Every structure is written in structure tokens, then in C-alpha cells.
């Protein structure tokens, strides 16, 4: 594959979801990325460029192809075959939005190959239909911090563009599949608990919109929707929470379904907190991340544009 054959690239950030009580609604982009580099070809194929995605299906059984094809089919279009190089540092099944990033990238892929000219709202709704909720997908699509509601016929989203914080993630070296994490959740919620849980979630949203990050951190651990049930799957959660609190962090939450644990701290203090947490959790990967203001980015090859005129 040479430069002249490259059509375009798609770069999509990973994400965290929930921030505690913002269950299936609140998402935040993180500075881990998935990148697709797309080349002209006579057949569909996928090539892994990083260890993170080693072993992904190389043909049309790849998730990215399947989502892209469903998107094209919805608009009555047929995609031309391409070769796709896949680069990613978003670990799979760790609660950092790897599947949502792949879905957003796939929709962007179909949009570019078929000239669909999808709006941001179109892309959000299509991605949310695939995911079942808009938190991770919305954050990967537009960047920043998002609050969303997905219904079959419509997806609503509010974007908070400047999350002026640092984030440290503690990533255990085991997977928690989303379906397993959902299996531990209760099938029903007592009315009184639902009322209290809703109030907690309301305060989280108000604190986010006010950019009162210390309050956001305090409220994250008051979640009643999922963390009390999923904590058994991630034994590091309470320990990270304790150490982070001792080091002055704003707060701690499961990232999505876990097992990654997200710690929110003051802007400029992420690297220092990363070093401190790494000392306490040597059996985990610990990384300092930022909240990118941009979501998915398309970069087109000018050589291809000239050739296509």
C-alpha cells in the first residue's frame, strides 16, 4: 500500500461512561485513540497495526465492516471494497469505549465511501442504535463531555465542551465483558431507591453543567444504579478510591462497565497522581489522560482528491 492509494483516515477518541450515577447517559472523551487508514483495494480487508487490536477479524466478519455495511444499506448504497489499516491504543473490554469508537469509525467510513453526507445528529442516532445508549458513542463522535438520551426514533445530546480536568485511569489486566457486567445488575429497582438514585443523578448533571468538579467527584461515588453491584467484579475499585482520596483527587468511578477505574483530578495534577497510583497498583496499567475537545476527525488524501476530479 503506497501513499497514492490512501483515500482518507478516520481518528476517533476512546471514552469513559457513566461517571457514577450518569448511567447509560453521561460520557466523556479520553485521549486514547482508534485510527483507520483506508486504501483503495479490490477486496475488503483489515490489517491490525498495534498489539491492542491484534487478532481482529481480517475480512467482512469485522465489526467495523458490519456496522459500515448496515449504515450504507440504510441509505441504499453499496460501499466500494477497501483495505483498512487499524491502529488503536484503546484496550478491548476494559470500559474505555473500544466498541463505541469502532462503531463511530465505521459510520464515518460508510459516510466517506458512499458520500452519505450524514449530519452529526444522524451519526449520533446510528451509533446509539448500535450501542443501545449514547454516552460512549456521543463522546467519541463530538469530544468533550456529553449527556444524552437514546430512544428508538430519536437521540438527544447536550455537549459540555471544556472539561477542564485531568483524568488518571487504572486499568487491570483482565477483561469485564459488558454483558457480564449487566448480568449482575438488579432486574427491578424499589420506588424509593429509584427516587433517591434519580436525585443523585440530577445533582451530578447540575455539578457538571456548573463545572463544579469537586462536587462531581463527591457525587460519583454516591451512585446507586450500577457501581454497588459491579464492585464485586472489580476488587481494585475501593482501594483506588481510598488512595485517590488520600492524594486529593476529586473522585473515582468505574469507567463504563469496568474494570478500568477512572480518577478525576485538578488540571495539571494528572501526572503526579499517575505516579502515586502506579506505586500502589503495580499489577495494573496506570495512565494520565486528558479530555479531548474534538471527536472523530477525517483527514482526506489531497492526492486522491485531485485524482478524483
UniProtKB/Swiss-Prot annotation:
Q: Which Pfam families match?
A: GHMP_kinases_C, GHMP_kinases_N
EC?
A: 2.7.1.39
Gene Ontology terms: biological process = threonine biosynthetic process
Protein name in UniProt: Homoserine kinase
Which residues bind ATP per the record?
91-101
Under catalytic activity, the entry for this protein gives: L-homoserine + ATP = O-phospho-L-homoserine + ADP + H(+)
Q: Which HAMAP family match?
A: Homoser_kinase (MF_00384)
The UniProt family comment states: Belongs to the GHMP kinase family. Homoserine kinase subfamily.
What superkingdom heads the lineage? Answer: Bacteria
Q: Name one GO molecular function term.
A: ATP binding
Q: List the disulfide bonds.
A: none
UniProtKB keywords: Amino-acid biosynthesis, ATP-binding, Cytoplasm, Kinase, Nucleotide-binding, Threonine biosynthesis, Transferase
Gene behind this protein: thrB
Report the locations given in the UniProt record: Cytoplasm
Task performed by this protein: Catalyzes the ATP-dependent phosphorylation of L-homoserine to L-homoserine phosphate.
Q: Which PROSITE patterns match?
A: GHMP_KINASES_ATP
This protein's pathway: Amino-acid biosynthesis; L-threonine biosynthesis; L-threonine from L-aspartate: step 4/5
**Example of a GO cellular component annotation carried by this entry:** cytoplasm
Amino acid at each position: 500500500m503506497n501513499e497514492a492509494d490512501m483515500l482518507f483516515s478516520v481518528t476517533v477518541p476512546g471514552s469513559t461512561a457513566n461517571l457514577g450515577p450518569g448511567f447509560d447517559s453521561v460520557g466523556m472523551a479520553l485521549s486514547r485513540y482508534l485510527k483507520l487508514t483506508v486504501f483503495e483495494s479490490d477486496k475488503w480487508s483489515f490489517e491490525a497495526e498495534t498489539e491492542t487490536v491484534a487478532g481482529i477479524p481480517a475480512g467482512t466478519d469485522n465489526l467495523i465492516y458490519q456496522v459500515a455495511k448496515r449504515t450504507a444499506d440504510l441509505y441504499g448504497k453499496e460501499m466500494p471494497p477497501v483495505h483498512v489499516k487499524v491502529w488503536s491504543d484503546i484496550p478491548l473490554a476494559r470500559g474505555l469505549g473500544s466498541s463505541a469508537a469502532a462503531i463511530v469509525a465505521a459510520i464515518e467510513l460508510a459516510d466517506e465511501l458512499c458520500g452519505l453526507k450524514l449530519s452529526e445528529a444522524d451519526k449520533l442516532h446510528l451509533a446509539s442504535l448500535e450501542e443501545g445508549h449514547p454516552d460512549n458513542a456521543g463522546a467519541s463522535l463530538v469530544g468533550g463531555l456529553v449527556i444524552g438520551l437514546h430512544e428508538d426514533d430519536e437521540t438527544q445530546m447536550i455537549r459540555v465542551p471544556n472539561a477542564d480536568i485531568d483524568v488518571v485511569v487504572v486499568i487491570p489486566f483482565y477483561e469485564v465483558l459488558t454483558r457480564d457486567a449487566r448480568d449482575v445488575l438488579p432486574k427491578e429497582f424499589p420506588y424509593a431507591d429509584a427516587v433517591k438514585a434519580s436525585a443523585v443523578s440530577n445533582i451530578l448533571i447540575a455539578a457538571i453543567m456548573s463545572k463544579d468538579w469537586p462536587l462531581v467527584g463527591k457525587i460519583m461515588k454516591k451512585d446507586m444504579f450500577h457501581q454497588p453491584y459491579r464492585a464485586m467484579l472489580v476488587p481494585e475499585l475501593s482501594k483506588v478510591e481510598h488512595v485517590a482520596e488520600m492524594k486529593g483527587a476529586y473522585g473515582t468511578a468505574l469507567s463504563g462497565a469496568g474494570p478500568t477505574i477512572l480518577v478525576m483530578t485538578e488540571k495539571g495534577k494528572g501526572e503526579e497522581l499517575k505516579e502515586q497510583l502506579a506505586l500502589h497498583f503495580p499489577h495494573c496499567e496506570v495512565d494520565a489522560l486528558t479530555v479531548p475537545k474534538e471527536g472523530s476527525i477525517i483527514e482526506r488524501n489531497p492526492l486522491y482528491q485531485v485524482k478524483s476530479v
